Structures are given as structure tokens and as C-alpha cells.
Amino acid sequence: MKALKGSWAILLAIFFALVYLIPLNGRLLWQPDETRYAEISREMLQRGDWVVPHLLGLRYFEKPVAGYWFNNISQWLFGDTNFAVRFGSVFSTGMTALLVFALAMLMWRNARRASLATLIFLSMVLVFSIGTYSVLDPMISLWLAAAMVSYYLTLKATTAKGKLGGYVLLGLACGMGFMTKGFLALAVPVIAVIPIVIQQRRIKDLLIYGPVAIVVAVLLSLPWALAIAQREPDFWNYFFWVEHIQRFAEDNAQHKAPFWYYVPVLMAAVLPWLALLPGSLLKGWRERVQRPELFFLLSWVMMPLIFFSIAKGKLPTYILPCMAPLALLMAAYAEDCVAALRSKVFKVNAVLNGLFGLICILALVVLGSGLLPKVHLFTAQEWPKIVIGIIAFAGWLLFAVVSVRNNAQRWSWAAACPLLLCLLIGYAIPQQVTDSKLPQNFIRVNMAELGHSRYVLTDSVGVAAGLAWELKRSDVLMFNQKGEVSYGLEYPDARSHLISDSDFPQWLAQARKQGDVSLVLQLSRGESIDQQKLPKADKVEVMNRLALFWYQQQP
């Protein structure tokens, strides 16, 4: 058993390093998400203010503060690097993986099954995609996984002291989740445990000990909640009504999508384990009486999934918390299939992975060969990127083939399918995507002008955050567009941060007396710089959809 634990620990550590650590600093930051979170934490560290989030020097109330603390600490430890920007997400994903292992050991006392569950979790497409991307979803997923483990401890406790301890841990997890992403962290655990409470007849325990969790969560959140209410009295009004009610429930909710939206998303999210999905969910339902731990996991998968499906606003990242319990279900289902000599599901899984790799290879060949004249993703000079992409998906295909042979023993090799993709994807991104969604490249190419400009403006918040991050300045101004900082711009002390196109000529005449001025525009598809009604610039640089208008200082 010790040898098993040691070999699995080494395997998981190597996998984690290859997928989650090594690629981090080699990829440019995506806008708007990564540039936003990078800059918010940089400004918090610069200001020494860990209570009120700011973006571009403006109040930014879209999220509470605990998720930023992860990123703050990462930047404090590792400096102003892309690795530091993403490490908060990686750390959270790693801790969630440890919780997956711990819960598996609590349920089954089986190190192999616990290790398999951890490997399945870490190799899921949604997990490694979001777990190496700077957003707050990995942090909230960590706290929801902690809430899941805590609640399981309350079910297994046989004494009042044990139950009390479990509910205290549940309150701590929910409190930190609330401080990371708001009331969602309170709603999801409540929804997830309802079927479990009914099935196991735990209503009395919930009524007795549930208030303990609520009190602990409130006590944990209260110092910051009071501090921000004192400094910014409108925070809670905006955060509750705009960020929760409008985003999820109202007809004008952000990211509206139909009820069935998460069906195809979930199928893609669990790759390279798609064939295990139906059987694992059915197993959790069919064996709900004989094996209540499987129904426990099923409830933590399906109830949040239904909740997010009902909500009008939807994004793929929202279902990340469902992946941890789903990985545990899949591990249990797969091991039972091996024990019962049912290998068909592993053959199907290998075939699905092989088809996925092959389809992606063919898609890259078609895109690179010019067979689709109306689709210009890569230029003729970017053939090395196409080759890199083909190699990445050839790795997916290769490990699919490996896993199909003697699949009762090698089925878990499917976890290696994404390895080359994770290591190489940063080198295969088309230049037009780089110049649209990865502004660091554009900024570095034009650093001579941007770095010496007294004023820097842009019409995109994501690009503005990238400029602020690269230039280490929070006074980047918005040009004619408010975007997601519209609320912060409404404050009287922030109105000078927005320059309209009609005011720009007059403003520019005054600004050039103080120094150079740089205006960065993100052009729409098909839009040219000739369509911009701007004062004549001393220098214009265009890289696909990003354009720099540089105005030299005038006396």
C-alpha cells in the first residue's frame, strides 16, 4: 500500500507539474479576464488596500475580495509575472484535488481509487482549462469542495462534538466562498444537500446544527463586510442587485443561454472521460440505497447543475464546482467496471478520444490548407503553428490508442491525452487571435511609445487592464466606451477617466502640452483605421485588430 501511495504521488506530482505549472509563464494573458484580475491585484498591492477592489483606479464592485487575496499573495511571492497572475487558480485547483483525494479516502479507504479520482479530476478539460486561467472560479470551486467534504464529515460523525465540528468547517468554507464570489457560495451547498437530507432523514440534524454553520460564516465574513460598507456604502446595493439578481435571474441577464446549454458543455468539460459520464451518473442513482455515498456525490453534481441551468445567465466556468464530485463518481464507476470485467466502456472512451484527436487534426489541416477560402484563421507564414497544433492533437490521438489496448489495465492512460495540448497550445495561437485577445504582445512591440506617454487611452477595458499591468500604472483612461467599469465611472471623482470622441480633439490639444499621448483602439472585424475620425497622429501602428495612435508632445 505504501508503494502504491508513493508511485501514485509521484505520478500525480509529475502530471500536475506538466499540466498546471510548466506552461503558466509561457502563455500571454488573455483579455478581458486575465488582464483584469492581474491588474486588480497589482493595484491592491500598490495601494496597500486589501478591502476595496479597484480597476484602473476606479471602484470595481463585481466580486468580493477573498479571490483577489489569492492573487495578491501570488503576485507578492512571485512578482509581476504571468506565472504569478495564474498561480492563484493553480493553487486552488491543487487544493481541490487534495480534497477530492481526502473525500475518496473517507468514503472508500482505497488509495488507488482516491488517486484515480484525483487524476480524473486534474485531467478534465474544464478543470485544467480554468485551473490554469486567472479567474475566480477555481477559488469558489475550492471552497465548495471544502463545503462538500465538511458536510460529508457531519454525516459520518457519530457524536454531537463530531457533528458540531463538521458544521463549523462547513461554515468556514461557506464564509470563504461568500467572500470569494458572493451569495452563490451559500446557495449551492444548500441546494446540493437537500436530496441528501431527505434521503438520509437528516432534517433534525440540519435544523439543530445548520445555524452553527450560518453563524460561523457570518462571523468570518463580518469584519470585511462591515469595513467595505463603511468605506463604500453603495457596495452591497450594487453587488446584490446588479451582480446577483440581474446577472442570473432577470431578462437582461448577462450571458443569456437556453436551459439545455450545459448539456454539450458538460460533455466537452469531462473529456477525456466522456464515456464514463452516463454510467457514473446512472450508478449514483441506481445504487442510491445500497451505496449512499454515491447518491451524495450525485446530488453535489446534479443539483448545482440544475440550478445553473435554470438561471438565465450562463457561462461554462459556472459548472466547475460540479467536476470534483463527478470525478469521484467516475472513479467509483470505472473501478467497478474493471472488477466486473466490463471493459466496453473503456473501449468506447478510447474511441471517443481518438475521434476527438483525429477531428481536431483534420480541422487544423483544413484551416491551414486554404480549403475554406472564407475562413482565414492562420496566415501562410504561420504553418509552424499549424504543425504544433497537429502535434498537440496527435498526442491526444496517440494516448487514446494506448488506452484502447488491454484497456482493463490501460484505460487510465486516457489522462495523458491532454498533455501535449497543455504544453504546446501557447505556441499554436493564430496571430490574429494574439493581436485581438492577448494584448501583451502588442504592448511590448510598441513599448517605446506607450512607456513614455504622459496619457494612455483605450476603448476596451480588457486592453486597458493589459496596458495598466504592463506599464505598471493605474491611470489608463477610457476612450468613448465605459464597458464593465461604467459603475466606477459614475462617481464624481472618476469622471475625468472617460474621454468621449467628441471631446477628444479639445482634450488632446491640452494633453499634448504635458507630454506624449497614446490612444489604443480595438477595431471591430472588418473595420479599418481610415474609418476613425481622429486628429492626425504622428505615428500609427496597426496589428490586426489593435491600433496605436501616437501623438507627440507639443509646446
Swiss-Prot record:
GO terms for cellular component: plasma membrane. It comes from the Bacteria. Pathway: Lipopolysaccharide metabolism; 4-amino-4-deoxy-beta-L-arabinose-lipid A biosynthesis. It comes from Serratia proteamaculans (strain 568). The chain crosses the membrane at residues 6-26, 87-107, 116-136, 178-198, 206-226, 257-277, 293-313, 315-335, 351-371, 384-404, 411-431. Keywords: Cell inner membrane, Cell membrane, Glycosyltransferase, Lipid A biosynthesis, Lipid biosynthesis, Lipid metabolism, Lipopolysaccharide biosynthesis, Membrane, Transferase, Transmembrane, Transmembrane helix. This is Undecaprenyl phosphate-alpha-4-amino-4-deoxy-L-arabinose arabinosyl transferase. It is found in: Cell inner membrane. Its main location: membrane. One of its GO terms (biological process) is lipopolysaccharide biosynthetic process. Catalyzes the transfer of the L-Ara4N moiety of the glycolipid undecaprenyl phosphate-alpha-L-Ara4N to lipid A. The modified arabinose is attached to lipid A and is required for resistance to polymyxin and cationic antimicrobial peptides. GO terms for molecular function: 4-amino-4-deoxy-L-arabinose transferase activity; mannosyltransferase activity. It is a multi-pass membrane protein. Belongs to the glycosyltransferase 83 family. The gene is arnT. InterPro entries: ArnT_tfrase, Glyco_trans_39/83, LipidA_mod_glycosyltrf_83. Disulfide bonds: none annotated. It catalyses: 4-amino-4-deoxy-alpha-L-arabinopyranosyl di-trans,octa-cis-undecaprenyl phosphate + lipid IVA = lipid IIA + di-trans,octa-cis-undecaprenyl phosphate. Its EC number is 2.4.2.43.
